[in-house]
Amino acid sequence: MIEVRLSPEAEADKERLPTQMKYRLDDVLERLESWPQVSGMKWLKHEWTGHARIRMGDWRVIFRIENDVLVVRIQHRSEVYEE
């Protein structure tokens, strides 16, 4: 099993999530622990090359894989790709 960590930005994003999304995030983080057998994952392109995302309704969990999984951002889909 792999370790899943949240960046400081992702920790702050998590605190701002609606309550129901926090429960769904827990499920997503559990799925990420079973890397590489993660369903619903998509590799990203352009400025997010090297990162992947999992959809959580209208929210996106952006992460990258190094020796473990680092969740970089957790944002609404209308905001996450603007950076």
Where are the regions a protein language model picked out?
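A short, surface-exposed loop/turn module that caps and links secondary-structure elements
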Residues: 30-54
